[in-house]
Each structure stands twice: as structure tokens, then as C-alpha cells.
């Protein structure tokens, strides 16, 4: 277990995670119209939220973990004071152009059908969900017994769960896209093809229809 502060310092100090975050933020900010509101779903300690607010986007943050939320309130104190960042107890408390979920937030949910159903009234038509999920095809994980044991499940079902305290679920992109319909349509996947063998995270852009 870790505290919010420990997680915050680790994420800021990890070159790999900083690079992943930079790519995710660049993609999100490039997709958002000027001044558009965004919900940071599973906002963690508010690192992304602070960046969105700095670029002029009213940012709502939903974070169920108390330790993370406490750190977020400290990290985004100035933004919260001027209402550039607003904490919400439920995603349904806002209506936005985009929902972002960075660093495997969606991997904590077994039922993506229910998740996208919940998010559908939050995102305006034409808006989007941008999610960073753990890549089930990453060959760097092949050294782990659980990856090899679940490879057949991935091929057959497109989904498996890792036995652990956090019960992380891994999904093939097609399974996420199927769960998102009919509310969202998969518009972009990065990386694609052979690139999926080398990246720990995959970015899915799902458009509200």
C-alpha cells in the first residue's frame, strides 16, 4: 500500500511515467476545443487536472480513494480556490466535453458496459472519452507467470483478471470498444499493430455518438 504523497512523488520522479503522461496530456489537450470542460475520472493526485486547468479548461475531478483525494486537494489548492478545478463526489455531477482516465483507471473495472453507461450522460454528443489502459499484449510482461497463464484467455475471450489485492483486469481493445457501444465509438488506438508488443500502456479514444 502507498500514501497519496508517495504515489505523487513516484509518478513525478519516474522518467517512464512522465513520458507516458506527457503523451497522454498532449493528446487530450490537442483534442479539446478551447475552454472546453473536462472530467478527470480517477484523477489520482491531480497531476493531469492541474495541467488541463493551466491550459484554460474547467476541470472536474472524481477520485474515490481518500489518500489520493487528500493529496489532490493539496496539489491543486490554488486551482480549487479559484474553481478552475472542482472536486465531485460522482461523475454525474457534471456534463463535459471530455472524460480522461489516465494510468489504467479503467483496468480497475470488470464491467465496462456499466462504466460506459454511467459516463454516457456526462459526455456531450461529439465529445470523447480518452483512456489509458494497461496493454495486454506488451511482451515485457511475458516474464511473469500470470501473463503466460492468461494468454489463452486473452486470445479466446479478450479479457482476464490478475489475482491480486487490486484485482486488475486486462482487456483487448475490441472488448473495450464493444462495451462502449452504442454510446461511444472507438475512433483511435495507439499504439497499433506491432507497436502493441512494446508499450506498457495503450491509449483509446472513444467518441460520443
Predicted regions and their residues:
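Conserved class I S-adenosyl-L-methionine
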Residues: 1-32, 35-44, 51, 130-155, 199
Amino acid at each position: 500500500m502507498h500514501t497519496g504523497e508517495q504515489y505523487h512523488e513516484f509518478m513525478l520522479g519516474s522518467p517512464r511515467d512522465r513520458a507516458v503522461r506527457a503523451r497522454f496530456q498532449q493528446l487530450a489537450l490537442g483534442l479539446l476545443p478551447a475552454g472546453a470542460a473536462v472530467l478527470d475520472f480517477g484523477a489520482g493526485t491531480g497531476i493531469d487536472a492541474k495541467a488541463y486547468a493551466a491550459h484554460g479548461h474547467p476541470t472536474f475531478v472524481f477520485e474515490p480513494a481518500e489518500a489520493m483525494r487528500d493529496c489532490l486537494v493539496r496539489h491543486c489548492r490554488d486551482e480549487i480556490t479559484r474553481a478552475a478545478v472542482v472536486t465531485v463526489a460522482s461523475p454525474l455531477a457534471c456534463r463535459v466535453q471530455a472524460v480522461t482516465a489516465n494510468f489504467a483507471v479503467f483496468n480497475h473495472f470488470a464491467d465496462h458496459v456499466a462504466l460506459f453507461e454511467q459516463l454516457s450522460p456526462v459526455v456531450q454528443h461529439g465529445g470523447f472519452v480518452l483512456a489509458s489502459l494497461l496493454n495486454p499484449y506488451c511482451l515485457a510482461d511475458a516474464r511473469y507467470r500470470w501473463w503466460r497463464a492468461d494468454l489463452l484467455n486473452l486470445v479466446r475471450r479478450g479479457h482476464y483478471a490478475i489475482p491480486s489485492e487490486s484485482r486488475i483486469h486486462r482487456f483487448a481493445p475490441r472488448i473495450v470498444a464493444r462495451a462502449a457501444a452504442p454510446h461511444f465509438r472507438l475512433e483511435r488506438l495507439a499504439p497499433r499493430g506491432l507497436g502493441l508488443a512494446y508499450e506498457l500502456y495503450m491509449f483509446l479514444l472513444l467518441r460520443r455518438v
